[in-house]
């Protein structure tokens, strides 16, 4: 069954099937789709969206429950298995259990030890305790006369006492020794006499004394300025009509504006609504 077409006459197409499908023709009858229905089918098809798969385990859709998956493997070989293990050649100690070693105590019998010969040690009669002085009593001094000691030849490598050059103790030259008093003799100083010329006497301004504010409480300081400027004469002062307050827009969006309405009639009553409702 075909669909309606915008053309006055529906005609069959002789183009291949793949081209008719791409052009939007119906492959069963070969009729072109109508204009109204074709505009409704311009959207993307189901194959355009790449949704995650719901089959398998890898990249499975997390919003869907996973279906059971099965794997097909080949049939196992029926050939006899070749045993390559060493077999029961391991020796397991029967005394070792999973709780530890379980066995009665065992003892070993050894041969007689070889007897050593008697040691040559002094007997009880070899000691003479009576010859020993009492331990807790004081003894008389005892001396021994020996041969004369051999004298060593004098050592010539040691310097003589006059070979040292000691620093003098005059002045403060050795810091570990107290220095002796030192004096210096200079020439006679001229007597202090006042100058004959008064111009040679220094004045108060010639002494470089520091500022007293540096080591005493700071004194008050004052500054002398010039005479203040006289005010302008009265004739130069602007009058009230010079200012235009209505044009000031510094502190507001626009200048204030006022409207003058008509005078209300004295006979007009006040509009009061019904208060009983």
Swiss-Prot record:
STPGR repeat spans: 122-148, 202-227, 238-263
Coiled-coil ranges per UniProt: none
A Gene Ontology term for the protein's cellular component: cytoplasmic microtubule
Spans annotated as Disordered: 181-277
Protein keywords: Repeat
InterPro entries assigned: CIMAP, SHIPPO-rpt
Xref: Pfam families: SHIPPO-rpt
Assigned protein family: Belongs to the CIMAP family.
This protein's name: Protein CIMAP1D
Protein source organism: Mus musculus
